[in-house]
Amino acid sequence: MELKILEKSDDEMKMEIAGESHTLLNMLKIILLEDERVHTASYDMKHVTISEPVLFIKTENADPIDVVKAAVAKLITECEEFVTVFNKAVE
């Protein structure tokens, strides 16, 4: 995975996340949209095998980098919770 910030302002950011697919981008988008500071969160992937996905976020009164950091932390927590529940279920 490689990440490149393509554009950044006080309330918008566009970043390319090379080597990833709809799986990660869709989960990240959903979590971003749950944050009240997020006005818009979307991603575009022109073609799954020849282009890299680009995530776009527009915030209200918040630095988009801070908002993405919070979303990633929440995603990690949700994955850890799933692992715990799954492991208990299969014991």
UniProtKB/Swiss-Prot annotation:
The yes or no answer to whether the keyword Hydrolase is present is no
Localization terms from the record: Cytoplasm
**Family membership noted in the UniProt record:** Belongs to the archaeal Rpo11/eukaryotic RPB11/RPC19 RNA polymerase subunit family.
Q: Indicate what this protein is called per its UniProt record.
A: DNA-directed RNA polymerase subunit Rpo11
A Pfam family recorded for this sequence: RNA_pol_L_2
Keyword terms of this UniProt record: Cytoplasm, DNA-directed RNA polymerase, Nucleotidyltransferase, Transcription, Transferase
Question: What GO annotations for molecular function exist for this entry?
Answer: DNA binding; DNA-directed RNA polymerase activity; protein dimerization activity
- Which gene is this protein's source? rpo11
Keyword Membrane assigned = no
List the PANTHER family.
DNA-DIRECTED RNA POLYMERASE I,II,III (PTHR13946), DNA-DIRECTED RNA POLYMERASES I AND III SUBUNIT RPAC2 (PTHR13946:SF28)
Name the domain of life: Archaea
Q: Which CDD domains match?
A: RNAP_L
Its predominant location is: cytoplasm
Q: How does it assemble?
A: Part of the RNA polymerase complex.
Report one GO cellular component.
DNA-directed RNA polymerase complex
> EC number(s) for this protein?
2.7.7.6
Q: What does this protein do?
A: DNA-dependent RNA polymerase (RNAP) catalyzes the transcription of DNA into RNA using the four ribonucleoside triphosphates as substrates.
- Gene3D superfamilies the record matches: RNA polymerase, RBP11-like subunit
One record GO biological process:
DNA-templated transcription
InterPro entries from the UniProt entry: RBP11-like, RBP11-like_dimer, RNA_pol_Rpb11_13-16kDa_CS, Rpo11-like
Q: Reaction catalysed? A: RNA(n) + a ribonucleoside 5'-triphosphate = RNA(n+1) + diphosphate
